[in-house]
Amino acid sequence: MDEVYLYSDATTSKIARTVTQKLGFSKASSSGTRLHRGYVEEATLEDKPSQTSHIVFVVHGIGQKMDQGRIIKNTAMMREAARKMEEKHFSNHATHVEFLPVEWRSKLTLDGDTVDSITPDKVRGLRDMLNSSAMDIMYYTSPLYRDELVKGLQQELNRLYSLFCSRNPDFEEKGGKVSIVSHSLGCVITYDIMMGWNPGGLYEQLLQKEEELPDERWMSYEERHLLDELYITKRRLREIEDRLHGLKAPSISQTPALKFKVENFFCMGSPLAVFLALRGIRPGNSGSQDHILPREICNRLLNIFHPTDPVAYRLEPLILKHYSNISPVQIHWYNTSNPLPYEHMKPNFLNPAKEPTSVSDSENIAAIPSPVTSPVLSRRHYGESITNIGKASILGAASIGKGLGGMLFSRFGRSSASQPSEPSKDSLEDDKKPSASPSTTTVATQTLPHSGSGFLDSAYFRLQESFFYLPQLLFPENVMQSKDDSLVELEHRIDFELREGLVESRYWSAVTSHTAYWSSLDVALFLLTFMYKHEHDTEAKPSLGSL
């Protein structure tokens, strides 16, 4: 065979071939494309595909059983958005970032079809949707099925990493990095895998503490003596067990949960902060990410959320409490020209300070903690989030209640003081005495009727004092914090907030925002910014050292 032609099966091509053949032209020369051996242009070394220097495992949340394969479609949308941003902003890099979906839900057995068998038939569609989505949260909080979910995701992550390394043998040798992007409940499961969190061990410790604190009110002297001996024996046994464990520790090395170290952990629409708060994690005073996720496990933790996402919560106030009054970092629009780097953005207040109208207002404003060099600016996006509106309403209700309470007690005090009574000599002498120094503040209270010593007044102030010390009684470990804790800044910002649209409806976005991260170009550019930042820092180190 000397010549090979390629023909099209389109209808127009067939009509053209028929007409040209009837006119006397050959079939090959009329509508076909002749194929030749060889190549048109010689290939070069630069024509090879770019090397993968960073892989990103994309972990889904709830609802995967309802729509199997959805994580593959979502990852494809995120990969496509990342490719557009790479071509626009990172075209000078010889490497690229690869996104790999992690589908862990379909392989789990859990309760089988038990929940489906007990589901009523009325409104079956809605019930099936809830069983396929929200039921995953109940499975994870169940002590019976939690381990199955954790092991399912852990094994799938390790399997995909081993498979990728087998097909790319030089990935680890050339220092390839691994990051994880988790969504919704997947953030909590991924966090527990990295931290090795075991609620069973904590429950055993709680039971052990309860056993060590029996009721000694009705014990006799002999019973208390035997109980003391039992405590000493248990303490001695615990010391021997610790020594034995210390001897076995060098020979037994604990296998890490993951076969790789996580460079960046991106949480999207994450309820992780709620789970950590319910587990007893309280704000500290260090300002470091190690308070919730040590650097030895993950180099960087970043929390991405939409302002109206009802499932997402902030993580920064769990590290430093006063960051609840500081707005999250606004994520740049993908088409912003010359955006300010995120590490150079200064914290902004959520509620700008107003001019004090009274002494109490000025004290409250002065007591608002803020980092050093933090400008008091309004939020740089259109409108406030629903969370801020709710917070403002709660604070407003509290201030109204406080004002009504003060008016009530002051009114009650005036009515009691209106009764005629002659001032005593002691009181007149006290009036002639010089007033206290300005540095001290005195509270003048009037005696209520039938209370010679001001019983109701003292009860009122004791009630206020008890409410002031209530958090100290509940969480005594967080009481001894210095007044300078409000001046501590975070080492790195963790909470990053997407910008709201100009004509975006908050009620509609509250329904759609939880699943709007996958196709967002802003999110794709944000992810690539932090992934390529490591390569830029690595390349800049030798030049800085030479200087």
From Swiss-Prot:
Disulfide bonds: none
Skewed-composition ranges (Basic and acidic residues): 423-434
A biological-process GO annotation: phosphatidylinositol metabolic process
Phenotype on disruption: Knockout mice have defects in the organization of mitochondria during spermiogenesis, leading to sperm malformation and male subfertility. Genetic loss of DDHD1 leads to substantial reductions in polyunsaturated lysophospholipids in the brain, and reduced mechanical, but not thermal nociception.
Ranges of Low complexity composition bias in the record: 435-448
Subcellular location(s) of the protein: Cytoplasm
Subunit structure: Forms homooligomers and, to a much smaller extent, heterooligomers with DDHD2. Interacts with SEC23A and SEC24C.
Protein name: Phospholipase DDHD1
Annotated source species: Mus musculus
Gene: Ddhd1
